């Protein structure tokens, strides 16, 4: 009645080798993925791709000088529309508007301005070999005038936000906070770790440092825009409570940065900058 079945042959060479350790690791990964899911991106902004070494600024513009001076790579139209003033220092990057807007000459700063609705757009045709040291002062003054006196939100950009726009931002910090090239570089690098101007651009910043020192032989160097801002109301104009435009939701200054700049205000009024602030 009963029939013997042939013995079952198992060829272990055909089975995947799974150790007890690997099984535990797989279980951990599965449970981790269930517990920790990425936060959804707000619907008003496009989803950013995964950050990698080739993509700086994965979360949008970074505020370098609170509350209203930002650094970024080539901006999209929605990002541009979040600002009042855009300074593009990349020769190869064109504006995304469908028309050329309205043009006027800013005789105060010797710059050509394009106006699109409420946005003032300045295109500076720098490439990586441009000798721009002599141009920096008028651009720094323009940034200071718009951000500090007119309380406008300012974006400085180039193609990647790494070299040319970083140089203009470093130059602004040099003159505004009375820092040398090295300290100003570290100041910007701390807030935007992607920056990395080449040595040719760093040498031009060193040249600009000499220009600043030469022009400041009579006292601390600051642009006329900064001096006028201080004379009016240093606290309200340099660090206004209400920006000219709505805050950019992508990146907002942290509470720690706000408190740090409160200390900077106090140290500037006393004529010195502490090591912690730089």
Curated annotation (Swiss-Prot):
Keyword Hydrolase annotated: yes
Domain Tyrosine-protein phosphatase, first and last residues per copy: 60-214
InterPro entries: Dual-sp_phosphatase_cat-dom, Prot-tyrosine_phosphatase-like, Tyr_Pase_dom, TYR_PHOSPHATASE_DUAL_dom
Alphabetically ordered keywords of this record: Cell cycle, Hydrolase, Protein phosphatase
Keyword Cell cycle on entry: yes
GO cellular component: cytoplasm; cytosol; nucleus
Known EC number: 3.1.3.48
Biased composition (Polar residues): 252-278
GO MF term list: MAP kinase tyrosine phosphatase activity; MAP kinase tyrosine/serine/threonine phosphatase activity; protein tyrosine/threonine phosphatase activity
GO aspect biological process, one term: signal transduction
Reactions that this protein is recorded to catalyse: O-phospho-L-tyrosyl-[protein] + H2O = L-tyrosyl-[protein] + phosphate
Region annotation (Disordered) ranges: 217-278
Membrane spanning stretches: none
Root EC class: hydrolase
Active site residues according to the UniProt entry: 158
Role: Dual specificity phosphatase that dephosphorylates MAP kinase pmk1 on a Tyr. Has a role in chloride ion homeostasis by inactivating this pmk1 MAP kinase pathway.
Family according to the record: Belongs to the protein-tyrosine phosphatase family. Non-receptor class dual specificity subfamily.
Protein name: Tyrosine-protein phosphatase pmp1
């Amino acid at each position: 009645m009963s029939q013997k079945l042939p013995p079952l042959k198992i060829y272990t060479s055909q089975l995947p080798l799974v150790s007890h350790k690997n099984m535990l690791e797989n279980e951990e990964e599965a449970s981790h993925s269930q517990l920790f899911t990425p936060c959804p991106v707000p619907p008003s902004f496009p989803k950013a791709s995964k950050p990698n070494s080739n993509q700086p600024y994965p979360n949008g513009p970074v505020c370098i000088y609170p509350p209203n001076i930002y650094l970024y790579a080539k901006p999209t139209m929605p990002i541009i529309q979040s600002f009042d003033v855009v300074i593009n220092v990349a020769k190869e990057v064109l504006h995304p508007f469908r028309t050329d807007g309205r043009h006027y000459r800013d005789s105060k700063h010797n710059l050509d301005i394009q106006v699109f609705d409420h946005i003032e757009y300045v295109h500076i045709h720098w490439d990586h070999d441009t000798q721009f040291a002599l141009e920096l002062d008028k651009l720094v003054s323009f940034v200071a005038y718009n951000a500090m006196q007119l309380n406008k939100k300012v974006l400085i950009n180039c193609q990647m936000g790494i070299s040319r726009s970083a140089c203009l931002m470093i130059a602004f910090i040099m003159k505004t906070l009375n820092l040398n090239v090295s300290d100003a570089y570290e100041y910007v690098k701390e807030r935007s770790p992607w920056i990395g101007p080449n040595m040719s651009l760093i040498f031009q910043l060193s040249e600009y440092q000499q220009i600043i020192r030469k022009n400041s032989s009579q006292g601390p160097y600051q642009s006329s825009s900064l001096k006028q801002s201080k004379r009016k109301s240093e606290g309200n104009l340099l660090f206004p409570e209400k920006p000219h435009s709505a805050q950019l939701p992508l990146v907002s200054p942290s509470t720690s940065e706000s408190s740090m700049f409160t200390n900077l205000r106090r140290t500037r009024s006393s004529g010195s900058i502490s090591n912690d602030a730089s």
